Amino acid sequence: EEIVVTGSRIATVDGFGQVAPVSVVSADDIKMTGMTRMEDLLNTLPQVETAQNSFISNGSTGTASVDLRGLGPARTLVLFNGRRLQPGGVNTQIPDINQIPAAIVERVEVLTGGASATYGADAVAGVVNFITRRVNGFEISGGYSAYQHNNGDKYIQGLMDARNFDYPTGDSGFDGEAYNLDLVMGTDFA
């Protein structure tokens, strides 16, 4: 069984190592939440903030970044199977965690203690390591979600009526919906 250790790149004697808080989210935890984006999953963890940055004026979603302890995404190192994740675009050096599909993630390790002595200055806030599972074959999964809001808050409606604001009433159907389809293929070449 393969073991990946986040927080140390140096071989050490058993029982001796760096003491730092590590949060681990397993594939089962990810499935239980129903989240399909790593950004949403990481937002549920303490001391983690994620953000969408758009560098294009046409409304592009941009890159999803990770910020540990509020020190900024440039101070949080993002690893993919123990290796640095490439920058998310030409306008930033910050990795885009939207590139990582939830369907292949085995676990996510979040080292919230500073790890700059091990990884360098971009790990001052900590390290997020995405560990993927080996896929041999073909997998497909999908999901659908929708939400509806009927503006039924009587207090807000009263304020809007007093000011003669127009607002939708009754059953207006779905206000929003989202579809998700993940296709994963893989094989062992060795």
What are the functions of these language-model segments?
Residues 11-12, 39, 43-84, 129:
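Extracytoplasmic beta-strand/coil segments of soluble accessory domains associated
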Residues 58, 86, 114, 144-148:
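Transmembrane beta-strands of outer-membrane beta-barrel pores
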Residues 127, 135-186:
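Short strand-turn segments of transmembrane beta-barrel domains in outer membranes
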Residues 38-41, 64-66, 96-98, 122-142, ...:
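N-terminal periplasmic accessory domains that precede
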Residues 3-33, 60, 88, 138-141, ...:
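N-terminal periplasmic "start-of-domain" segments of outer-membrane beta-barrel proteins
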Residues 83-112, 158-159, 173:
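Short acidic/polar hinge/loop motifs at secondary-structure boundaries
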Residues 2, 20-40, 65-71, 94-98, ...:
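Short, polar/charged loop or turn motifs at beta-strand boundaries
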Residues 22, 30, 42, 108-109, ...:
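Non-catalytic regulatory/gating segments with a bias toward low-complexity or hydrophobic composition
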